[in-house]
């Protein structure tokens, strides 16, 4: 499929990257689909970077209620991130979260999610002082030396008591 030696090597590398990303010990011949997937990945990473640089434009949080099974009361919520891009439309979390992790953008993104979720929880505590907000952290965030000070600063800024925050590891860990 290549016209030049350089293209041949480039396409072989794309196929190798694809094979590694989709399971070990695989042999994958290059196809135009691999190039299309790689192009989409690069475009999404660039758009994620732009969204973050422009104040997390297109990102929003939705909240999954956590309900007490005994009495049906909402006792907390889990913060879930969503992203809509003008050029790409609604991008599923299963697609954009791994790209944030691979690119290192998960660190500023995760800090934004944490702060926004804590702001929301602090407001919702007016209805129920025992309300608990759960936030998922990526393994990349756990490696950050600034994580604990960042959480402490956000707790202080939002007035959310530490007992009202649950920090969880993402499933990708």
Enumerate the language-model features and the residues they cover.
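Cyclic nucleotide signaling catalytic output domains
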Residues: 1-22, 28-47, 95, 99, ...
């Amino acid at each position: 499929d290549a016209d030049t030696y350089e293209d041949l090597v480039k396409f072989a590398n794309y196929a190798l990257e694809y094979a590694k990303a989709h399971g070990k010990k695989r042999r994958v011949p290059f196809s135009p689909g691999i190039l299309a997937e790689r192009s989409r990945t690069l475009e999404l990473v660039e758009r994620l970077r732009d969204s973050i640089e422009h104040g997390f434009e297109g990102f929003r949080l939705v909240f999954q209620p956590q309900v007490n099974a005994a009495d049906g009361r909402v006792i907390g919520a889990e913060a879930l991130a969503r992203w809509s891009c003008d050029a790409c439309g609604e991008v599923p979390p299963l697609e954009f979260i791994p790209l944030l992790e691979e690119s290192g953008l998960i660190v500023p993104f995760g800090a934004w999610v944490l702060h926004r979720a804590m702001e929301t929880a602090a407001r919702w505590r007016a209805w129920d002082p025992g309300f608990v907000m759960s936030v998922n952290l990526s393994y990349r965030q756990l490696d950050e030396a600034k994580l604990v000070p960042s959480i402490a600063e956000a707790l202080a800024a939002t007035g959310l008591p530490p007992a009202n925050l649950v920090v969880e590891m993402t499933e990708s860990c």
